[in-house]
Regions:
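Carbohydrate-binding/catalytic loop surfaces
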Residues: 24-42, 89-100, 129-149, 186-207, ...
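Alpha-helical scaffold segments in carbohydrate-active enzymes
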Residues: 10, 14, 53, 73, ...
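Well-ordered alpha-helical scaffold segments within catalytic/enzyme domains
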Residues: 1, 45-60, 92-106, 149-163, ...
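Low-complexity, Ser/Thr/Pro/Gly-enriched N-terminal "stalk/linker" regions
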Residues: 1-73, 77-80, 103-131, 184, ...
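Residue-level detector of extended alpha-helical repeat arrays and alpha-solenoid scaffolds
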Residues: 44, 64, 90-93, 110, ...
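Active-site cradle of extracellular carbohydrate-active enzymes
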Residues: 154-158, 166-218
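Extended ligand-binding groove/face enriched in aromatic
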Residues: 64-160, 167-171
Length: 339
């Protein structure tokens, strides 16, 4: 296999040269671009994260230039604001902007993050015993994708701005998520509840990114409290995901079209962070590397593009979400080094 850094660079090159629209100055959803492209806000938050990954790995300023172009393009395409109907979409953007602040030191990013966060907090309501709503026009549907990322935001803002209210928000959101959407026996994270207004949990919806964001929330809380129980919980969630969702070789298979394309990359982002917290997670490092090897050896086509099935090259129309997920997985593996 080529060095992982070379594979990352090829995937990042394809991201920019195949999905960037020079006229609209924003990423498009598909390559080749379709005649009609809908606006999918949250994919752009992860595009920003992927560009930051490239900068962290290379220190090449063109990644920050691309980040700024995509940041401005996404803001413009969303109507001159980062506020949105879907709370979880705004949460992904907020996390990307907090990270941009950490990397660049530019206060405008965290100021924008706080502005969005203030709107996100309107998601909390008493339906289902509390928790953050998924979207503004369905306030009684509560799910992990709207809650765990919000807890991560709250804990990260607390660590940067030292506002006690942020810590309190994070604690109550995380508690709700663990109380309502975690299997207490296995630590597997369920997606959501009351989607159809019947109060039921969607036990059959099993997704990698739900595991990833709870790993992230528990890990951030462990950092704040120095409570190893939450770090251990993050490890249990990460390992249960491998047992429940990966194949016999430890490879996470295609999860579905459209939004599902992003899920694995999100999981691996937070699993990577977990591996940096303790030496207890060598097995999880190997899982990241295994999946990256499969992408590099089997999943990348001649254009450097990667589809949903990492075990084979994809041709025809490919979407941004699937490619981004692979880029993020490769970038996490690059941080672990070649082996």
């Amino acid at each position: 296999m080529k060095k992982i850094e070379e594979v990352c660079e090829r995937a990042q090159y394809a991201l920019w040269n195949r999905f960037w629209d020079n006229e609209k100055e924003v990423f498009v959803n598909h390559y080749p671009v379709k005649e009609e492209e809908s606006w999918i806000y949250w994919w752009h938050a992860h595009a920003l994260d992927a560009l930051l990954d490239g900068f962290v790995r290379t220190k090449e300023t063109y990644y920050l230039e691309r980040f700024e172009a995509e940041y401005e393009g996404a803001f413009r395409e969303n109507g001159g604001t980062f506020l949105h109907n879907w709370y979880d979409d705004m949460e992904w953007m907020t996390l990307a902007l907090i990270r941009a602040f950490d990397i660049t030191g530019e206060k405008r990013y965290i100021e924008q993050a706080v502005y969005i966060w203030n709107d996100i907090k309107t998601a909390w309501n008493d339906s289902c015993g509390g928790g953050m709503a998924w979207k503004k026009d369905q306030l009684d549907y509560k799910n992990t994708p709207a809650n765990a990322p919000a807890a991560i935001i709250a804990f990260r803002l607390y660590q940067r701005l030292h506002r006690e209210e942020d810590r309190e928000w994070g604690e109550k959101i995380l508690k709700w998520n663990l109380d309502h959407l975690m299997d207490p026996d296995t630590c597997f994270i369920w997606d959501g509840m009351n989607r159809l207004g019947d109060g039921k949990v969607d036990y059959e919806w099993k997704f990698t990114y739900c595991q990833g964001v709870v790993i992230g929330a528990a890990m951030e809380y462990a950092r704040i409290t120095n409570n190893k129980e939450y770090l251990d919980l993050a490890g249990k969630v990460a390992r249960r995901a491998v047992t429940e969702l990966a194949d016999a070789d430890g490879i996470f298979p295609y999860e579905g079209p459209d939004d599902c394309g992003l899920f694995r990359g999100i999981y691996f982002r937070y699993v990577y962070e977990l591996t940096q917290e303790s030496s207890e997670y060598e097995d999880l490092k190997e899982i990241i590397k295994k999946n990256a090897r499969v992408i590099a050896e089997n999943g990348m086509n001649e254009d450097g593009l990667i589809g949903g099935d990492w075990r084979q090259k994809s041709e025809g129309t490919l979407d941004l979400a699937q490619h981004l997920s692979a880029v993020m997985t490769l970038e996490m593996a690059a941080k672990l080094g070649d082996s």
